From Swiss-Prot:
The keyword RNA-binding applies. This is Small ribosomal subunit protein bS20. NCBIfam families: S20. Belongs to the bacterial ribosomal protein bS20 family. It holds the Pfam family Ribosomal_S20p. InterPro entries: Ribosomal_bS20 (IPR002583), Ribosomal_bS20_sf (IPR036510). The keyword DNA damage does not apply. One of its GO terms (biological process) is translation. The gene is rpsT. Transmembrane segments: none annotated. GO terms for cellular component: cytosol; small ribosomal subunit. Keywords: Ribonucleoprotein, Ribosomal protein, RNA-binding, rRNA-binding.
Length: 87
């Protein structure tokens, strides 16, 4: 544990940010999993709507600094390619 007051405050801030990032990444994984499940089931209309949701969540996570913006774009591109190949 830190002894300096400012370092103790930073530990609290880091814990909050870590919890937020963990929550956002979990939501991303869930959204991607649901998209892939609907794609595997052959429900393409639902997959299209879920892809829009995944894209939105990925770009929001990139805007908040949870993931890099290039990673978000790459994931969106790969998921869209996966959808287009399935259709």
């Amino acid at each position: 544990m830190a002894n300096i007051k400012s370092a103790q405050k930073r530990i609290l801030v880091i814990n909050k940010k870590t919890a937020r990032n963990r929550m956002i990444k979990s939501q991303l994984k869930t959204a991607i999993r649901r998209f892939e499940e609907s794609l595997a089931a052959g429900n393409f209309e639902e997959a299209k709507t879920r892809l829009k949701l995944v894209e939105k969540k990925l770009h929001q996570a990139a805007a908040k600094g949870t993931i890099h913006k290039a990673k978000a774009s790459r994931k969106v591109s790969r998921l869209a390619t996966k959808l287009n190949k399935a259709i």
